[in-house]
Amino acid sequence: MNDSRETLEGASALALPGAGRYALRRTRVLGRTLGAPSGPLDADGFGLVDILVDEGAIAKIAPAGAIDFGAMPEVAMAGRIALPLFVDVHTHIDKGHIWRRKRNPVGDFRSALAAVIEDRAANWTAPDVAARMEFSLRSAYAHGTAALRTHIDSVGAQTRISWPVFAEARERWRGRIELQASPLFSIEFVLDDSHMADIEAMLDAHGTGILGAVTYMVPRLHEGLTRLFALAERKGWELDFHVDESADPAARSLKAVADMAIERRFSHRILAGHCCSLALQEEDERRKTIDAVASAGLGVVSLPMCNMFLQDRETGRTPRWRGVTAIHELKRAGVHVMIASDNTRDPFYPYGDLDMMETWREGVRILHLDYPFADWAPAVSAFPAQAMGLDLGVLRQGGPADMILTRARDFTELLARPQSDRIVVRHGKASSARPPDYAELDALFGLAP
Protein backbone atom coordinates (compact mmCIF):
# COMPACT_ATOMS: atom_id res chain seq x y z
CA MET A 1 0.00 0.00 0.00
CA ASN A 2 1.41 3.39 -0.90
CA ASP A 3 1.87 6.12 1.69
CA SER A 4 -1.15 8.12 0.51
CA ARG A 5 -3.60 5.47 1.69
CA GLU A 6 -5.18 5.14 5.13
CA THR A 7 -5.91 1.90 6.98
CA LEU A 8 -8.49 0.98 9.59
CA GLU A 9 -6.37 -0.56 12.34
CA GLY A 10 -7.74 0.75 15.65
CA ALA A 11 -10.44 2.82 17.22
CA SER A 12 -8.34 5.96 16.91
CA ALA A 13 -6.58 5.05 13.65
CA LEU A 14 -9.36 5.76 11.16
CA ALA A 15 -8.47 9.09 9.63
CA LEU A 16 -10.01 10.44 6.48
CA PRO A 17 -7.55 11.90 3.99
CA GLY A 18 -7.07 15.64 4.06
CA ALA A 19 -7.74 15.77 0.34
CA GLY A 20 -11.24 16.57 -0.85
CA ARG A 21 -11.23 13.57 -3.19
CA TYR A 22 -10.77 10.04 -1.84
CA ALA A 23 -12.21 6.52 -1.95
CA LEU A 24 -13.71 4.29 0.73
CA ARG A 25 -12.64 0.83 -0.41
CA ARG A 26 -14.64 -2.35 0.29
CA THR A 27 -17.26 -0.64 2.40
CA ARG A 28 -20.12 -2.77 3.69
CA VAL A 29 -23.52 -1.14 3.21
CA LEU A 30 -27.12 -2.23 3.59
CA GLY A 31 -28.89 -2.35 0.26
CA ARG A 32 -31.91 -0.70 1.89
CA THR A 33 -29.78 2.35 2.71
CA LEU A 34 -28.63 2.97 -0.87
CA GLY A 35 -30.35 5.33 -3.25
CA ALA A 36 -29.89 2.80 -6.07
CA PRO A 37 -28.81 -0.87 -6.27
CA SER A 38 -25.07 -1.50 -6.43
CA GLY A 39 -24.15 -5.15 -6.74
CA PRO A 40 -25.14 -8.37 -4.97
CA LEU A 41 -26.27 -8.54 -1.33
CA ASP A 42 -25.55 -11.20 1.26
CA ALA A 43 -28.14 -13.05 3.35
CA ASP A 44 -28.36 -10.14 5.80
CA GLY A 45 -28.89 -7.55 3.08
CA PHE A 46 -25.35 -6.16 2.99
CA GLY A 47 -23.23 -5.52 -0.08
CA LEU A 48 -19.60 -4.52 -0.58
CA VAL A 49 -19.04 -1.27 -2.45
CA ASP A 50 -16.44 1.35 -3.17
CA ILE A 51 -17.50 4.93 -2.48
CA LEU A 52 -15.83 7.88 -4.19
CA VAL A 53 -16.03 11.12 -2.22
CA ASP A 54 -15.35 14.30 -4.16
CA GLU A 55 -15.41 17.72 -2.48
CA GLY A 56 -18.07 16.85 0.05
CA ALA A 57 -20.31 14.81 -2.25
CA ILE A 58 -20.66 11.13 -3.09
CA ALA A 59 -19.48 11.07 -6.68
CA LYS A 60 -19.74 7.31 -7.21
CA ILE A 61 -20.96 4.13 -5.53
CA ALA A 62 -19.93 0.93 -7.31
CA PRO A 63 -19.51 -2.76 -6.48
CA ALA A 64 -16.20 -3.28 -4.70
CA GLY A 65 -13.32 -3.54 -7.16
CA ALA A 66 -15.39 -2.57 -10.20
CA ILE A 67 -13.69 0.77 -10.76
CA ASP A 68 -10.05 1.80 -10.82
CA PHE A 69 -9.85 5.00 -8.82
CA GLY A 70 -6.20 5.47 -9.68
CA ALA A 71 -3.72 6.86 -7.19
CA MET A 72 -6.14 8.91 -5.12
CA PRO A 73 -6.06 8.56 -1.31
CA GLU A 74 -8.02 5.60 0.01
CA VAL A 75 -9.52 4.41 3.26
CA ALA A 76 -9.32 0.62 3.48
CA MET A 77 -12.66 -0.13 5.13
CA ALA A 78 -12.03 -3.89 4.94
CA GLY A 79 -15.73 -4.72 5.07
CA ARG A 80 -16.64 -2.30 7.85
CA ILE A 81 -20.15 -0.86 7.77
CA ALA A 82 -21.10 2.63 6.60
CA LEU A 83 -24.56 4.01 7.38
CA PRO A 84 -26.43 7.11 6.32
CA LEU A 85 -26.89 9.77 8.97
CA PHE A 86 -29.91 9.21 11.17
CA VAL A 87 -33.27 10.99 11.10
CA ASP A 88 -35.01 11.36 14.47
CA VAL A 89 -38.66 12.12 13.75
CA HIS A 90 -40.16 12.26 17.27
CA THR A 91 -38.40 14.07 20.13
CA HIS A 92 -39.13 16.56 22.91
CA ILE A 93 -36.12 18.86 23.13
CA ASP A 94 -38.12 21.56 24.94
CA LYS A 95 -38.54 19.33 28.00
CA GLY A 96 -35.28 17.38 27.79
CA HIS A 97 -32.76 17.21 30.65
CA ILE A 98 -35.00 18.43 33.49
CA TRP A 99 -34.65 15.20 35.51
CA ARG A 100 -32.13 16.74 37.93
CA ARG A 101 -34.74 19.38 38.72
CA LYS A 102 -37.97 17.38 38.51
CA ARG A 103 -38.08 13.61 38.81
CA ASN A 104 -40.88 11.19 38.14
CA PRO A 105 -41.63 9.90 41.66
CA VAL A 106 -43.03 6.50 40.64
CA GLY A 107 -42.10 6.08 36.96
CA ASP A 108 -45.54 5.93 35.34
CA PHE A 109 -47.15 8.12 32.67
CA ARG A 110 -49.52 10.02 34.94
CA SER A 111 -46.73 11.01 37.32
CA ALA A 112 -44.51 12.02 34.40
CA LEU A 113 -47.18 14.34 33.03
CA ALA A 114 -47.81 15.94 36.42
CA ALA A 115 -44.08 16.48 37.01
CA VAL A 116 -43.58 18.14 33.64
CA ILE A 117 -46.57 20.45 34.13
CA GLU A 118 -45.17 21.56 37.49
CA ASP A 119 -41.66 22.14 36.14
CA ARG A 120 -42.96 23.95 33.07
CA ALA A 121 -44.96 26.41 35.15
CA ALA A 122 -42.07 27.07 37.52
CA ASN A 123 -38.99 27.09 35.31
CA TRP A 124 -39.49 27.16 31.55
CA THR A 125 -38.26 30.64 30.77
CA ALA A 126 -36.81 31.38 27.35
CA PRO A 127 -33.19 31.05 28.58
CA ASP A 128 -33.98 27.75 30.31
CA VAL A 129 -35.65 26.25 27.24
CA ALA A 130 -32.92 27.58 24.94
CA ALA A 131 -30.11 26.09 27.03
CA ARG A 132 -31.71 22.65 27.14
CA MET A 133 -32.59 22.69 23.45
CA GLU A 134 -29.01 23.62 22.56
CA PHE A 135 -27.61 20.84 24.74
CA SER A 136 -29.95 18.34 23.11
CA LEU A 137 -29.04 19.39 19.59
CA ARG A 138 -25.32 19.26 20.30
CA SER A 139 -25.80 15.69 21.53
CA ALA A 140 -27.84 14.63 18.50
CA TYR A 141 -25.35 16.24 16.13
CA ALA A 142 -22.37 14.52 17.74
CA HIS A 143 -24.08 11.13 17.48
CA GLY A 144 -24.81 11.49 13.76
CA THR A 145 -28.32 12.90 13.34
CA ALA A 146 -29.07 14.84 10.17
CA ALA A 147 -32.66 15.86 10.86
CA LEU A 148 -34.88 16.03 13.91
CA ARG A 149 -38.51 16.83 14.64
CA THR A 150 -39.49 17.99 18.10
CA HIS A 151 -42.85 18.37 19.74
CA ILE A 152 -43.23 21.62 21.67
CA ASP A 153 -45.51 21.96 24.68
CA SER A 154 -47.95 24.64 23.51
CA VAL A 155 -50.35 25.51 26.30
CA GLY A 156 -51.02 28.93 27.82
CA ALA A 157 -48.11 31.34 28.12
CA GLN A 158 -45.58 28.62 27.26
CA THR A 159 -46.63 28.74 23.61
CA ARG A 160 -45.28 32.28 23.22
CA ILE A 161 -42.09 31.43 25.11
CA SER A 162 -40.98 28.22 23.43
CA TRP A 163 -41.78 28.81 19.76
CA PRO A 164 -39.49 31.85 19.29
CA VAL A 165 -36.75 29.90 21.08
CA PHE A 166 -37.22 27.01 18.67
CA ALA A 167 -37.12 29.35 15.67
CA GLU A 168 -33.82 30.81 16.86
CA ALA A 169 -32.38 27.32 17.35
CA ARG A 170 -33.55 26.26 13.91
CA GLU A 171 -31.77 29.21 12.32
CA ARG A 172 -28.64 28.66 14.38
CA TRP A 173 -28.46 24.99 13.38
CA ARG A 174 -29.31 25.54 9.72
CA GLY A 175 -26.97 23.49 7.55
CA ARG A 176 -26.11 21.13 10.39
CA ILE A 177 -29.42 19.61 11.57
CA GLU A 178 -32.67 20.09 9.68
CA LEU A 179 -35.20 20.99 12.38
CA GLN A 180 -38.98 20.73 12.39
CA ALA A 181 -41.51 21.18 15.17
CA SER A 182 -45.11 20.32 15.96
CA PRO A 183 -47.22 21.85 18.76
CA LEU A 184 -48.24 19.56 21.61
CA PHE A 185 -51.53 19.98 23.45
CA SER A 186 -54.51 17.79 24.30
CA ILE A 187 -57.22 17.50 21.67
CA GLU A 188 -59.75 19.27 23.93
CA PHE A 189 -57.79 22.52 23.50
CA VAL A 190 -58.78 22.56 19.82
CA LEU A 191 -62.27 23.56 20.99
CA ASP A 192 -60.85 26.71 22.64
CA ASP A 193 -60.84 29.47 20.01
CA SER A 194 -58.39 31.62 21.96
CA HIS A 195 -55.93 28.77 22.30
CA MET A 196 -56.10 27.92 18.62
CA ALA A 197 -55.63 31.57 17.66
CA ASP A 198 -52.37 31.54 19.63
CA ILE A 199 -51.31 28.29 17.98
CA GLU A 200 -52.03 29.59 14.50
CA ALA A 201 -50.14 32.82 15.18
CA MET A 202 -47.10 31.02 16.55
CA LEU A 203 -46.98 28.53 13.69
CA ASP A 204 -47.37 31.31 11.15
CA ALA A 205 -44.46 33.18 12.73
CA HIS A 206 -42.15 30.39 13.83
CA GLY A 207 -43.47 27.01 12.69
CA THR A 208 -42.47 24.53 10.02
CA GLY A 209 -45.89 23.74 8.55
CA ILE A 210 -46.89 21.03 11.02
CA LEU A 211 -49.90 20.97 13.33
CA GLY A 212 -50.49 18.38 16.02
CA ALA A 213 -52.30 17.31 19.17
CA VAL A 214 -52.59 14.49 21.69
CA THR A 215 -55.62 12.31 20.93
CA TYR A 216 -57.47 9.99 23.25
CA MET A 217 -61.05 8.93 23.86
CA VAL A 218 -62.78 12.11 25.01
CA PRO A 219 -66.48 12.85 24.35
CA ARG A 220 -65.80 15.54 21.75
CA LEU A 221 -62.93 13.77 19.95
CA HIS A 222 -64.67 13.87 16.57
CA GLU A 223 -65.37 17.59 16.87
CA GLY A 224 -61.80 18.30 17.91
CA LEU A 225 -60.38 16.29 15.01
CA THR A 226 -62.76 17.99 12.59
CA ARG A 227 -61.56 21.44 13.64
CA LEU A 228 -57.91 20.41 13.62
CA PHE A 229 -58.12 18.87 10.15
CA ALA A 230 -60.01 21.92 8.87
CA LEU A 231 -57.29 24.27 10.10
CA ALA A 232 -54.57 22.10 8.59
CA GLU A 233 -56.41 22.06 5.27
CA ARG A 234 -56.89 25.82 5.29
CA LYS A 235 -53.22 26.46 6.07
CA GLY A 236 -51.74 23.63 3.98
CA TRP A 237 -50.14 22.08 7.06
CA GLU A 238 -49.15 18.50 7.83
CA LEU A 239 -50.38 16.72 10.95
CA ASP A 240 -48.42 14.93 13.67
CA PHE A 241 -50.32 13.28 16.51
CA HIS A 242 -49.56 11.64 19.83
CA VAL A 243 -52.06 8.78 19.75
CA ASP A 244 -53.32 6.26 22.31
CA GLU A 245 -50.28 6.28 24.58
CA SER A 246 -52.14 3.94 26.88
CA ALA A 247 -52.50 0.34 28.01
CA ASP A 248 -56.28 0.55 27.68
CA PRO A 249 -57.51 -1.51 24.69
CA ALA A 250 -60.51 0.83 24.51
CA ALA A 251 -58.18 3.68 23.50
CA ARG A 252 -58.97 3.76 19.77
CA SER A 253 -58.36 7.31 18.64
CA LEU A 254 -55.93 6.06 15.98
CA LYS A 255 -58.91 4.67 14.08
CA ALA A 256 -60.68 8.02 14.46
CA VAL A 257 -57.68 9.89 13.00
CA ALA A 258 -57.39 7.48 10.07
CA ASP A 259 -61.13 7.59 9.36
CA MET A 260 -61.10 11.40 9.44
CA ALA A 261 -58.20 11.51 6.97
CA ILE A 262 -60.05 9.15 4.62
CA GLU A 263 -63.36 10.97 4.96
CA ARG A 264 -61.81 14.37 4.23
CA ARG A 265 -59.36 13.05 1.62
CA PHE A 266 -56.62 14.86 3.48
CA SER A 267 -53.75 15.41 1.06
CA HIS A 268 -50.84 16.23 3.36
CA ARG A 269 -48.62 13.93 5.39
CA ILE A 270 -49.90 12.58 8.71
CA LEU A 271 -47.72 10.96 11.35
CA ALA A 272 -49.08 9.09 14.37
CA GLY A 273 -46.78 8.48 17.32
CA HIS A 274 -46.98 5.84 20.06
CA CYS A 275 -50.25 4.00 19.19
CA CYS A 276 -49.51 1.72 22.17
CA SER A 277 -53.01 0.40 22.82
CA LEU A 278 -53.23 -1.01 19.29
CA ALA A 279 -51.08 -3.95 20.40
CA LEU A 280 -53.57 -4.88 23.13
CA GLN A 281 -56.79 -4.82 21.12
CA GLU A 282 -58.69 -7.85 19.88
CA GLU A 283 -57.41 -9.13 16.54
CA ASP A 284 -60.48 -8.08 14.57
CA GLU A 285 -60.45 -4.56 16.00
CA ARG A 286 -56.71 -4.22 15.44
CA ARG A 287 -57.02 -5.38 11.83
CA LYS A 288 -59.75 -2.82 11.10
CA THR A 289 -57.63 -0.02 12.53
CA ILE A 290 -54.50 -1.08 10.65
CA ASP A 291 -56.46 -1.31 7.39
CA ALA A 292 -57.74 2.23 7.96
CA VAL A 293 -54.25 3.51 8.78
CA ALA A 294 -52.88 1.96 5.59
CA SER A 295 -55.76 3.31 3.47
CA ALA A 296 -55.29 6.81 4.90
CA GLY A 297 -51.55 6.75 4.21
CA LEU A 298 -50.56 7.51 7.79
CA GLY A 299 -47.02 6.92 8.97
CA VAL A 300 -46.55 5.41 12.42
CA VAL A 301 -43.61 6.02 14.72
CA SER A 302 -42.90 3.76 17.69
CA LEU A 303 -40.94 5.06 20.67
CA PRO A 304 -39.61 1.80 22.09
CA MET A 305 -37.38 3.03 24.90
CA CYS A 306 -39.78 5.53 26.43
CA ASN A 307 -42.86 3.36 26.01
CA MET A 308 -41.17 0.34 27.57
CA PHE A 309 -40.20 2.54 30.53
CA LEU A 310 -43.67 4.00 31.12
CA GLN A 311 -46.23 1.44 30.02
CA ASP A 312 -47.45 -1.46 32.18
CA ARG A 313 -45.60 -0.08 35.20
CA GLU A 314 -46.96 -0.89 38.64
CA THR A 315 -44.90 -0.66 41.80
CA GLY A 316 -43.82 -4.12 42.93
CA ARG A 317 -45.15 -5.86 39.81
CA THR A 318 -43.14 -7.16 36.87
CA PRO A 319 -44.38 -5.74 33.55
CA ARG A 320 -46.19 -8.16 31.26
CA TRP A 321 -45.97 -6.02 28.10
CA ARG A 322 -43.21 -4.06 26.40
CA GLY A 323 -45.44 -1.04 25.85
CA VAL A 324 -44.99 -0.81 22.08
CA THR A 325 -47.38 -0.75 19.15
CA ALA A 326 -48.14 -3.52 16.64
CA ILE A 327 -45.29 -2.46 14.41
CA HIS A 328 -44.89 -5.73 12.50
CA GLU A 329 -48.58 -5.89 11.62
CA LEU A 330 -48.52 -2.26 10.50
CA LYS A 331 -45.48 -2.86 8.31
CA ARG A 332 -47.06 -5.97 6.80
CA ALA A 333 -50.07 -3.84 5.81
CA GLY A 334 -47.81 -1.44 3.91
CA VAL A 335 -47.65 1.30 6.53
CA HIS A 336 -44.38 3.22 6.73
CA VAL A 337 -43.21 2.51 10.28
CA MET A 338 -40.29 4.10 12.04
CA ILE A 339 -38.71 4.41 15.48
CA ALA A 340 -37.42 7.51 17.26
CA SER A 341 -35.86 8.75 20.49
CA ASP A 342 -38.83 10.47 22.18
CA ASN A 343 -38.00 11.94 25.60
CA THR A 344 -34.51 12.41 26.99
CA ARG A 345 -33.64 12.67 30.69
CA ASP A 346 -36.98 14.05 31.78
CA PRO A 347 -39.89 12.62 33.85
CA PHE A 348 -41.14 10.61 30.87
CA TYR A 349 -37.77 8.88 30.38
CA PRO A 350 -34.74 9.47 32.62
CA TYR A 351 -32.24 8.00 30.15
CA GLY A 352 -31.23 8.52 26.53
CA ASP A 353 -29.02 11.02 24.72
CA LEU A 354 -30.73 11.57 21.36
CA ASP A 355 -28.42 8.88 20.01
CA MET A 356 -30.28 7.12 17.21
CA MET A 357 -27.71 4.34 17.23
CA GLU A 358 -28.90 3.55 20.76
CA THR A 359 -32.54 3.86 19.68
CA TRP A 360 -31.92 1.45 16.81
CA ARG A 361 -30.08 -1.06 19.01
CA GLU A 362 -32.77 -1.03 21.66
CA GLY A 363 -35.55 -0.98 19.08
CA VAL A 364 -34.21 -4.15 17.49
CA ARG A 365 -34.21 -5.87 20.87
CA ILE A 366 -37.57 -4.56 22.12
CA LEU A 367 -39.51 -4.84 18.85
CA HIS A 368 -37.72 -7.85 17.29
CA LEU A 369 -36.54 -5.88 14.27
CA ASP A 370 -33.97 -8.46 13.23
CA TYR A 371 -35.65 -11.15 11.13
CA PRO A 372 -34.82 -9.90 8.56
CA PHE A 373 -32.58 -7.17 9.93
CA ALA A 374 -32.12 -5.26 6.67
CA ASP A 375 -35.84 -4.66 6.17
CA TRP A 376 -35.95 -2.43 9.24
CA ALA A 377 -32.96 -0.18 8.52
CA PRO A 378 -35.14 2.48 6.81
CA ALA A 379 -37.05 2.90 10.10
CA VAL A 380 -34.24 5.12 11.44
CA SER A 381 -33.25 6.80 8.20
CA ALA A 382 -35.17 6.80 4.91
CA PHE A 383 -38.72 6.43 6.27
CA PRO A 384 -38.51 9.23 8.85
CA ALA A 385 -36.82 11.40 6.22
CA GLN A 386 -39.77 10.80 3.92
CA ALA A 387 -42.17 11.57 6.78
CA MET A 388 -40.39 14.90 7.17
CA GLY A 389 -40.38 15.58 3.43
CA LEU A 390 -36.59 15.49 3.27
CA ASP A 391 -34.19 13.94 0.77
CA LEU A 392 -32.10 12.30 3.48
CA GLY A 393 -31.58 8.89 5.04
CA VAL A 394 -29.83 7.13 2.15
CA LEU A 395 -26.38 7.00 0.57
CA ARG A 396 -26.70 8.03 -3.06
CA GLN A 397 -24.55 9.20 -5.93
CA GLY A 398 -24.72 12.96 -6.20
CA GLY A 399 -25.81 13.31 -2.59
CA PRO A 400 -23.75 14.77 0.23
CA ALA A 401 -20.95 12.66 1.66
CA ASP A 402 -22.74 12.42 5.00
CA MET A 403 -22.40 9.04 6.69
CA ILE A 404 -21.39 7.11 9.77
CA LEU A 405 -18.36 4.83 9.55
CA THR A 406 -18.18 1.96 12.03
CA ARG A 407 -15.81 -0.87 12.85
CA ALA A 408 -18.64 -3.41 12.67
CA ARG A 409 -18.70 -5.93 9.81
CA ASP A 410 -22.15 -7.48 10.25
CA PHE A 411 -25.37 -6.72 12.07
CA THR A 412 -24.41 -8.54 15.27
CA GLU A 413 -21.17 -6.56 15.56
CA LEU A 414 -23.09 -3.39 14.75
CA LEU A 415 -25.69 -3.89 17.47
CA ALA A 416 -23.68 -5.72 20.13
CA ARG A 417 -21.69 -2.58 20.99
CA PRO A 418 -22.79 1.06 21.23
CA GLN A 419 -20.44 2.10 18.40
CA SER A 420 -18.91 4.77 20.60
CA ASP A 421 -15.94 4.89 18.23
CA ARG A 422 -18.09 5.66 15.17
CA ILE A 423 -16.83 8.32 12.79
CA VAL A 424 -19.51 10.82 11.80
CA VAL A 425 -18.72 12.17 8.35
CA ARG A 426 -20.35 15.38 7.17
CA HIS A 427 -19.67 16.74 3.70
CA GLY A 428 -16.76 14.34 3.38
CA LYS A 429 -14.99 15.46 6.55
CA ALA A 430 -14.81 13.67 9.89
CA SER A 431 -16.78 15.62 12.46
CA SER A 432 -14.95 16.62 15.63
CA ALA A 433 -18.21 17.17 17.54
CA ARG A 434 -18.56 15.34 20.84
CA PRO A 435 -21.54 15.15 23.20
CA PRO A 436 -21.53 18.06 25.67
CA ASP A 437 -20.66 17.64 29.33
CA TYR A 438 -23.69 17.35 31.62
CA ALA A 439 -22.02 19.86 33.95
CA GLU A 440 -22.87 22.55 31.40
CA LEU A 441 -26.49 22.31 32.61
CA ASP A 442 -25.67 22.65 36.32
CA ALA A 443 -26.54 26.35 36.47
CA LEU A 444 -30.12 25.57 35.44
CA PHE A 445 -30.51 23.39 38.52
CA GLY A 446 -28.76 25.63 41.03
CA LEU A 447 -25.75 23.36 41.30
CA ALA A 448 -22.41 24.88 42.25
CA PRO A 449 -19.59 24.50 39.71
Where are these regions (language model features)?
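N-terminal metal-binding scaffold of metallo-dependent hydrolase/deaminase domains
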Residues: 1-69, 411
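Active-site metal-binding motif and surrounding structural segment of the metallo-beta-lactamase
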Residues: 65-83
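Alpha-helical scaffold segments that flank or form the walls of functional sites
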Residues: 80, 99-151, 157-172, 198-204
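Di-metal (Zn2+ and/or Mg2+/Mn2+) metal-binding site signature of metallo-dependent hydrolases
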Residues: 80-101, 246-247
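Active-site gating loops and adjacent loop-to-helix segments of metal-dependent hydrolytic enzymes
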Residues: 96-129, 207, 235, 253-271, ...
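Histidine/acidic residue-rich metal-binding segments in metalloenzymes
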Residues: 161-175, 191-299, 316-339, 393
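His/Asp/Glu-enriched, well-ordered alpha-helical/loop segment
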Residues: 238, 259-270, 310, 321-406
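C-terminal cap of metal-dependent C-N hydrolases
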Residues: 386, 397-449
